[in-house]
Amino acid sequence: MAGNSQRRGAIRKSGTKKGTSVGSGGQRRRGLEGRGPTPPAHMRPNHPAAKRAKAQQRRPARGRTDETETVLGRNPVLECLRAGVPSTALYVALGVEADERLTESVSRAADSGIPILEVPRTDLDRMTANHLHQGIALQVPPYNYAHPDDLLAAALDTPPALLVALDNISDPRNLGAIVRSVAAFGGHGVLIPQRRSASVTAVAWRTSAGAAARMPVARATNLTRALKDWADRGVRVVGLDAGGDTAIDDLDGSDPIVVVVGSEGKGLSRLVRQTCDEVVSVPMAGPTESLNASVAAGVVLAEIARQRRT
């Protein structure tokens, strides 16, 4: 091997002896020394293997629907780590100002054997497309969706069941906000269709403020069929639509309920609407015609929670 002076017969030319190597002394890594195993090459942002992996992810793959996601922000990251969400790497920006959340995140990641990598903030910006990462990001595998039957069974075990189903909701921020509202008002989970729907992406994780780590989300191959199955098991299917014929004031929230939320633009699809036992609306004052889907869902969930407290 060239330059190996220990090899028999090796001769080093005069003047080629290397001088003393000068490095950083480990200053950049000292803050995270002993905090966790070194990530593999494909997880290091500037490593050629990572660049190849990223390029490969951008290519369309036959049958592939979900990719590894990056959860951003101190609250969502900490919630994921507290909930034991499977994670592949924790990235921390160099020189970031630490607080209790960041310190706990690093500690939990180390205890769980999650690789921790300190990177320049500019690298973190590029990794997250300049989203508001607050100096920390957690790489997680695709979300593990629950089965609709399992979601319902768990809800029925702690009656009265309160579930939310989404129809024509394509914005992951709406999904994340609704997941957060379901958790806040004592709901048991969210049901989404497998096609033409927002999924639990990094954007949804962040909008949910980490609630997606503890609130199950199920995927149905056919939303209408899943709702009919739930109805057969004693769950009242209540649609939420601006054109609903029942005012929220007249809604009886004491029974096991699944609230089906339609999009602000399209509302409920025809088949889903026909599956509903009733369709409620939120009365509006003034010129405002409709509410954002996540806001409307929060209003209905708050009303049901109020009724169940009294």
From Swiss-Prot:
Biological process (GO) annotations? Answer: methylation; RNA processing
Q: Which controlled-vocabulary keywords does the entry list?
A: Methyltransferase, S-adenosyl-L-methionine, Transferase
Q: Which SUPFAM superfamilies match?
A: alpha/beta knot (SSF75217), L30e-like (SSF55315)
**UniProt-listed Enzyme Commission number(s):** 2.1.1.-
Cite the InterPro entries for this sequence: Alpha/beta_knot_MTases, Ribosomal_eL30-like_sf, rRNA_MeTrfase_TrmH, SpoU_MeTrfase, SpoU_subst-bd, tRNA_m1G_MTases_N
**Extent of Basic residues compositional bias:** 49-62
Top-rank taxon = Bacteria
Please provide, alphabetically and separated by semicolons, the GO molecular function terms listed in this UniProt record: RNA binding; RNA methyltransferase activity
Residues annotated as binding S-adenosyl-L-methionine: 262, 282, 291
User: Into which EC class is this enzyme placed?
Assistant: transferase
Sequence segments annotated as region (Disordered): 1-70
One Pfam family name is: SpoU_methylase
May I have one GO cellular component term?
Answer: cytosol
Similarity-based family: Belongs to the class IV-like SAM-binding methyltransferase superfamily. RNA methyltransferase TrmH family.
UniProt name for this protein: Uncharacterized tRNA/rRNA methyltransferase MMAR_5079
Protein species of origin: Mycobacterium marinum (strain ATCC BAA-535 / M)
Record lineage = Bacteria, Bacillati, Actinomycetota, Actinomycetes, Mycobacteriales
